Amino acid sequence: MSTYLIGDIHGCYRELRALLTKANFDPTKDTLWLTGDLVARGPDSLKVLRYVKQLGSAARMVLGNHDLHLLGVYAGISRNKPKDKIDTLLSAPDADELINWLRKQPLLQFDDDLKLLMTHAGITPQWDLETAKMCASEVETMFNSSCYPLFLNSMYGDMPNNWSPELSGLARLRFSTNALTRMRYCFPNGQLDMLCKDKPENAPAPLKPWFELERQIPPEYAIVFGHWASLEGQGTPDSFYALDTGCCWGGQLTMLRWEDKQYFTQSSLPAVKQH
């Protein structure tokens, strides 16, 4: 019985299946944790969603910013960008079922026995473990409610970018969503910077990758995240695991078997020619 952790799939269904085959993943006894961004940019978002959904309890995913954007597009709130390649998904006969399943997925996964935490972008250094769990749960509750389109309409925006327990309403939910699904850099005081997307060596001072600031999460917990493909899985301190290695950009899909820390990779496959 193994625990596998896989980076952002972005519609790269063939690479996903090839990677799981390489690792001898068995959904009847193994568990697959996914860092989010199952959809968009790659060619087969529909197949990825269908596959992960049918894994049932063998899959533990978190929502990423591209997954949230899909929810917005489907609700008629966000614009469908051709580069996301989600038209087939939007028009699928089971689109309703898939979207309703997707919006009920969490933003944070944790296992206290394995001492493992996963979110899409990371955990802001301004949060301790209980605050992270609470804030993720608040956003999840909103997405599970009938008024979730109201939040989708207010989700976009970079402010507020500083955590306070006094934050409330949509502003609090927006901060939490940004911290869990979009964050890369912080100022030294932990404030989020939502603009810089460069590699760490090119980032302007005083910005630091969120994982370089002092954390409030207990040190025995590992934090697993995706989102930041330009890291190429490198440069994080001990107990931080960056798993997005840019498969949809011609890089590779990366998976980690937790029990023995063995990595498995699958290079991006050439596009299938349409006849």
Curated annotation (Swiss-Prot):
Per the UniProt entry, the Enzyme Commission number(s) are 3.6.1.41
Sorted keywords for this record are:
Hydrolase
One MF term from GO for this chain? bis(5'-nucleosyl)-tetraphosphatase (symmetrical) activity
The answer to whether keyword Hydrolase applies is yes
| InterPro entries assigned | ApaH, Calcineurin-like_PHP_ApaH, Metallo-depent_PP-like
| Catalytic reaction(s) noted | P(1),P(4)-bis(5'-adenosyl) tetraphosphate + H2O = 2 ADP + 2 H(+)
Q: Report the protein's function.
A: Hydrolyzes diadenosine 5',5'''-P1,P4-tetraphosphate to yield ADP.
Under the heading HAMAP family, the entry gives:
ApaH
The UniProt family comment states: Belongs to the Ap4A hydrolase family.
Protein name as annotated: Bis(5'-nucleosyl)-tetraphosphatase, symmetrical
State the organism's lineage. Bacteria, Pseudomonadati, Pseudomonadota, Gammaproteobacteria, Enterobacterales
